[in-house]
Amino acid sequence: MNLHALCLLLLLLGSSTKAGEIIGGTECIPHSRPYMAYLEIVTSDNYLSACSGFLIRRNFVLTAAHCAGRSITVLLGAHNKTYKEDTWQKLEVEKQFIHPNYDKRLVLHDIMLLKLKEKAKLTLGVGTLPLSANFNFIPPGRMCRAVGWGRTNVNEPASDTLQEVKMRLQEPQSCKHFTSFQHKSQLCVGNPKKMQNVYKGDSGGPLLCAGIAQGIASYVHPNAKPPAVFTRISHYRPWINKILREN
């Protein structure tokens, strides 16, 4: 198995592993990230899996292509995904739009839009997240935040609450050990000297820079050491806009 496939498996949350927190991060203030979506996935092999995602329109969620499955249920308005609140909205996915150039082996073009069967109701607990503008090429050096329901560490016990962590955009050379990394369509994120990273279960979650979604969590090294690779949203705005316009 190549390095990229192994890394992808470690970001995707399988049925045999409990979800936990982002590594080196902190628990979000409840409902301070109202656009966050927890994805309950039935895979093509009928296993249960999970990813993160985020609401960009009342009827569309953006996530990673490797989070695709036989069926997906989206949970909105959650902080602790095991503790039901009045803010919760559970919506079924009507259609999964995987990027036509998605390469599972190389983990390229790892982006997917989910059209919901019903429109979400916008409330204090459920809202949408703005996306990076077309071809807004955010440079290395910016400090951003990753958000998701991933694990705290490779062997840490699980937590079910939404987490966030500060991560700095790196120069592309920092991701040269990922042989298929493409700077034009991906972001290299996280200081290699700090153990702050996304991990298993964070796939599909956003990278937020000044309140704008700039990236989508894709993969990381199996030992969870930074940097991580995120899909660069600005590169895909024409495709995103086309799907939203036609559906």
From Swiss-Prot:
Active site (UniProt): H66 (charge relay system), D110 (charge relay system), S203 (charge relay system)
Glycosylation sites: N80
Pfam families: Trypsin
One GO MF term: serine-type peptidase activity
KW Lyase (keyword) present: no
Chief site of localization: secreted
Catalytic activity: Preferential cleavage: Phe-|-Xaa > Tyr-|-Xaa > Trp-|-Xaa > Leu-|-Xaa
Name of the molecule in the record: Chymase
Organism: Rattus norvegicus (Rat)
Record localization: Secreted; Cytoplasmic granule
GO biological process: basement membrane disassembly; cellular response to glucose stimulus; cytokine precursor processing; extracellular matrix disassembly; midbrain development; peptide metabolic process; positive regulation of angiogenesis; protein catabolic process
Peptidase S1 domain residues: 22-245
Propeptide, chain numbering: 20-21
EC number: 3.4.21.39
Highest taxon in the source lineage: Eukaryota
